[in-house]
Curated annotation (Swiss-Prot):
Disulfide bonds: none annotated. This is Large ribosomal subunit protein uL16. It comes from Geobacillus kaustophilus (strain HTA426). Keywords: Ribonucleoprotein, Ribosomal protein, RNA-binding, rRNA-binding, tRNA-binding. Gene3D superfamilies: Ribosomal protein L10e/L16 (3.90.1170.10). Part of the 50S ribosomal subunit. One of its GO terms (cellular component) is cytosolic large ribosomal subunit. Pfam families: Ribosomal_L16. GO terms for molecular function: rRNA binding; structural constituent of ribosome; tRNA binding.
Length: 141
């Protein structure tokens, strides 16, 4: 599972998910990517499930890049506990994803294989996603 090695503070505010992603909106490492169309918290378990679905379908062929990292802790209080008496204990880790963010990239496989692998991965995630290709820009030195 993905999680930070160490953090400065154990608990964090929930925050707000406004607007579109600032960076990481283009495919850089592979040839194909999976882009978020909605904003959400994506847990480390969901990221791992999507990664497994992709690698299992590609049968160890090609390479997978994970472009999101779960660096935000979320807390939960135990069941049947009354309100109040402080914030709950850290429960897990989430990555904050905004629309436009490329979450996964795939390289070294054909477009059909990449499309199906990323489709399987998108079913493991709680948001709508779309398949994107690397933009070929000419004239770069």
């Amino acid at each position: 599972m993905l999680m930070p090695k160490r953090v400065k503070y154990r608990r964090e505010h929930r925050g707000r998910m406004k607007g579109r992603a600032k960076g990481g909106t283009e495919v850089h490492f592979g040839e194909f990517g999976l882009q978020a169309l909605e904003s959400a918290w994506i847990t480390n378990r969901q990221i791992e499930a999507a990664r497994r679905a992709m690698t299992r379908y590609m049968r160890r062929g090609g390479k997978v890049w994970i472009r999101i990292f779960p660096s935000k802790p979320y807390t939960a209080k135990p069941l049947e506990v009354r309100m109040g008496s402080g914030k709950g204990a850290p429960e897990g880790w989430v990555a904050v994803v905004k629309p436009g963010k490329v979450m996964f990239e795939v390289g070294g496989v054909s477009e059909e294989v990449a499309r199906e692998a990323l489709r399987l991965a998108s079913h493991k995630l709680p948001i709508k996603c779309k398949f994107v290709k690397r933009e070929e820009t000419g004239g770069e030195a």
